[in-house]
A protein has these predicted regions:
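Conserved strand-to-loop turn within each blade of WD40 beta-propeller repeats
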Residues: 44-47, 81-85, 123-126, 174-177, ...
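WD40/WD-repeat beta-propeller blade N-cap
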Residues: 23-30, 61-68, 102-108, 152-159, ...
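Sequence/structural segment immediately N-terminal to covalent heme-attachment motifs in c-type
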Residues: 333-354, 365
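Electrostatic cytochrome c docking/interface patches
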Residues: 315-342
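Residue-level detector of Asp-centered blade-edge/turn motifs that repeat once per structural unit
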Residues: 35-38, 74-76, 115-116, 166-167, ...
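Hydrophobic beta-strand positions that form the internal "hydrophobic ladder"
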Residues: 41-42, 79, 120, 171, ...
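Extracytoplasmic electron-transfer domains, predominantly the class I c-type cytochrome c fold
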Residues: 359, 363-415, 428, 432
């Protein structure tokens, strides 16, 4: 479950002041970034893995069966992650092992650790918030004592974000139902209190109870600070860019960072409630992940690329934006033959055509035709495909996209998508037939 690889590329050491650097190695977009008190970085990716970026390069924590959406440090030695497979995993960096400790009935969008260092909160698209208490984290993974998850109900749509107060007595949650709620954790069965009624879905949430405010970002681009007790707006930083997808706060500098769907990172000085920098960080897509270094000098960001970018905050407007190259699924479709276009738009984000699966969310398609499903050696399959009798052929690939993966292979973790037009399926199959042929020895 824990595998090391030396494929990180540093443009500059993070110890050198005011230098920009990147972390490379994931096989899919970066969905979340967390930073330990020591400054070490963990990442959640569309490639189904959690990355831990230590001094010797990346270590991959593998156990999730779908895209990982969220990650957090419980301490310098323990990481938690939540994913599209509905599960919450906790990982020990010391023992090189992990364990699934709880599960929702829909994707987990956010995870947060309480000040006690033992209680994890999870935000899920099943409209619920989960509280999972774990004791014995200083022992082996097998010896951890995990309580049954307590579920908090009240939201009428999926929950996107959660945050504890510093005393751990209150939890705040943001939902697609357009509300932000507070929960009294001394009485989990008590009804929640609606603090904000935004209307549009609220995606991200930062709580600063020491200064008496919370900040949130919404699907319509709404970006506001509100009074923590009354919910009254005390500052509005909405610029019309939507949606807001990521937020990070640094308690040292009191700077708030907001990432959006148009590739900008906006910085706000919360002491004077003023925008200080508005940086076009990505030329090709959204900013899904943001996190500060412990001293507040660096902002780490992730998006549609499989790279983490780290900029020095003080001079980041003098640095270049994300320039990792155009991802294959973003290439101009007009410039491509139809079969290649279908592959790059529908398949390339998850699958490679090389011998290696290249750390992507799905197995390599090299040697696809004539191969039994579930047999690529460098990929971890779901139980559904591990024992499948399907042999990939023109007929089975056609059926896969005609019916949709969820109907052709019930229980698969493949995305639910169809290629409706027969000529598009035919062109894709022709393209795969030409580009997945194994080389003769």
């Amino acid at each position: 479950m824990l595998r090391a690889a030396c494929i990180v590329i540093w443009l500059a050491s993070p110890s050198i002041g005011q230098d920009f650097y990147t972390l490379k190695g994931h096989g899919g977009p970066i969905m979340d970034i967390a930073v330990s008190p020591l400054g070490e970085i963990s990442t959640a990716s569309f490639d189904n893995a959690v990355g831990f970026w230590g001094t010797d390069g990346p270590v991959w924590l593998e156990g999730h069966r779908a895209a990982v959406n969220t990650v957090c440090f419980l301490n310098n030695k323990i990481i938690a992650s939540g994913a599209d497979d509905f599960t919450l995993w906790v990982w020990s960096l010391e023992s090189a092992s992990g364990r699934m400790v709880a599960a929702h009935t829909a994707k987990i969008a956010d995870v947060a650790i309480a000040p006690d260092g033992q209680t994890l909160a999870t935000a899920s698209w099943d409209n619920k918030i989960g509280l999972t208490h774990i004791e014995g984290l200083d022992g082996s993974v097998e010896s951890w004592l995990v309580d049954d998850m307590i579920l908090l109900s009240g939201h009428r749509a999926g929950v996107n974000a959660i945050a504890f107060t510093q005393d751990g007595q209150t939890l705040y949650s943001a939902s697609m139902d357009g509300t932000i709620r507070s929960w009294n954790l001394n009485d989990p069965k008590a009804p929640s209190t609606v603090i904000v009624k935004h209307g549009f879905g609220v995606n991200r949430l930062i709580v600063n109870d020491a200064d008496g405010w919370l900040a949130y970002g919404a699907a319509d681009g709404g970006t506001r600070m509100v009074d923590l007790n009354t919910g009254e707006t005390i500052a509005d930083f909405t610029l019309g860019r939507r949606p807001v997808l990521s937020m990070a706060y640094d308690p040292v500098t009191k700077m708030l960072a907001i990432g959006d769907g148009q590739g900008y990172i906006m910085f706000i000085d919360t002491t004077v409630r003023r925008i200080t920098t508005d940086f076009k960080a990505s030329l090709t897509g959204p900013i899904w992940a943001l996190s500060y270094s412990p001293d507040g000098e660096y902002i780490h960001a992730g998006g549609i690329e499989d790279i983490v970018y780290s900029w020095p905050v003080a001079v980041m407007d003098k640095h270049i934006p994300m320039v990792g190259g155009i991802q294959s699924f973003l290439e101009d479709p007009i410039s491509l033959p139809n079969g290649e276009r279908q592959f790059k738009r529908k398949c390339s984000i998850c699958h490679s055509l090389t011998k290696s699966s290249a750390r992507k969310a799905g197995p390599s398609l090299y040697g696809l035709f004539g191969r039994k499903a579930g047999t690529v050696v460098d990929y971890t399959y779901s139980d559904t495909l591990s024992g499948s009798s399907i042999v990939w052929s023109e007929e089975s690939v056609n059926a896969l996209f005609d019916l949709g993966p969820d109907h052709f292979i019930p229980g698969t973790k493949m995305p639910m998508q169809r290629i409706v037009k027969k000529h598009d399926r035919d062109d894709l199959i022709d393209y795969l037939g030409t580009n997945t042929v194994q080389e003769e020895n």
